[in-house]
């Protein structure tokens, strides 16, 4: 099923599908994108992470050709992105206006008609789990159903490269997870995906590689595991600041403060707990966990991923 939608074969691990080089976007009084550079290997799901206002949507719109860069270049398989790129890219915009009084079926057919190379209608419907909704008006769709329709619209031209801009914003937890399943199926078929998100859990589930963006700059790029291993050596012990009986300045560990929580990074949990115990009023509030992308973003930028 997926292979019929994505007829380009399986990717080679080292092929670069997309590259952004020194992208700059200057608005009057605002530098929205400040020399952003990153590359996306063929066949992976690549996540561009950042809080609202980081510049990630502007960067992606420049790559898509929706917004013109002040300077910088976008390359698609080693060539300046041009007609071939536009024919082979599928875009699910964060905010796409759909006509209210036409059906799901009519919407898919309308967008298919815009392309010479068209995906099979039935395969798109099956891929996006829209079979029971074909005769429903767009205005009657739930948030999750609407996002599945927008994904179907992004697949109508059998894209080799798919852009998903904040695709699960506003969805309930179950709808988000259902959408993740759809994205993973598309990724398994060999397509390259560029995903923007400010959800840490979404990036950890879906992305093979990520770039972290803040204040218009790319500040880190790599696989989630690589970046976490580079930043952290050990586990994190969490305890509420309100449970401290005195300060921890004498404790020789890496300490972070985040939303009323002290986080201690340590390679020796037992020893750290032994040192912390005399300073804590309620030991039952202590938690031990693995570092995650939210921690990484906070440490690199000084603020939360969802700020």
Question: Residue spans of the language-model regions?
Answer:
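ABC-family P-loop ATPase nucleotide-binding domain
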Residues: 2-24, 303-307
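ABC transporter nucleotide-binding domains
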Residues: 17-18, 25-195, 200-214, 220
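A generic structural signal for secondary-structure junctions
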Residues: 77, 90, 116, 229-233, ...
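Generic structural signal for individual residues within well-ordered alpha-helical segments
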Residues: 108, 122-125, 177, 228, ...
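ABC transporter nucleotide-binding domain
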Residues: 181-267
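Short, charged/small-residue-rich alpha-helical element at the C-terminal edge
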Residues: 233-307
């Amino acid at each position: 099923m997926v292979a019929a939608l994505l007829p380009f074969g399986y990717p080679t691990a080292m092929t670069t599908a997309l590259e952004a080089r020194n992208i700059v976007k200057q608005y009057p009084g605002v530098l929205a994108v400040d020399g952003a550079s990153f590359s996306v290997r063929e066949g992976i799901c690549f996540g561009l992470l950042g809080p609202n206002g980081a510049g990630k949507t502007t960067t992606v719109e420049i790559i898509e050709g929706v917004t013109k860069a002040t300077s910088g270049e976008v390359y698609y398989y080693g060539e300046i992105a041009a007609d071939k790129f536009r024919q082979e890219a599928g875009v699910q915009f964060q905010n796409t206006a759909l006509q209210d009084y036409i059906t799901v079926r009519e919407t898919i057919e309308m967008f298919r008609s815009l392309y010479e190379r068209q995906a099979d209608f039935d395969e798109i419907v099956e891929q996006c789990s829209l079979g029971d909704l074909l005769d429903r008006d767009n205005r009657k769709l739930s948030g999750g159903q609407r996002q599945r329709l927008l994904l179907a619209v992004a697949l109508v031209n059998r894209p080799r490269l798919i852009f998903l801009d904040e695709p699960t914003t506003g969805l309930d937890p179950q709808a988000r997870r259902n959408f993740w399943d759809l994205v993973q199926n598309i990724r398994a078929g060999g397509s390259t995906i560029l995903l923007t998100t400010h959800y840490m859990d979404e990036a950890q589930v879906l992305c093979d590689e990520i770039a972290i963006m803040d204040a218009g700059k790319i500040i880190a790029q790599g696989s989630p595991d690589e970046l976490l291993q580079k930043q952290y050596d050990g586990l994190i012990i969490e305890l509420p600041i309100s449970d401290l009986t005195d300060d921890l300045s004498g404790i020789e560990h890496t300490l972070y403060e985040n939303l009323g929580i002290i986080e201690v990074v340590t390679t020796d949990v037992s020893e750290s707990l032994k040192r912390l115990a005399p300073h804590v009023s309620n030991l039952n509030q202590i938690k031990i966990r693995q570092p995650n992308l939210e921690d990484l973003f906070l440490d690199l930028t000084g603020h939360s991923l969802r700020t």
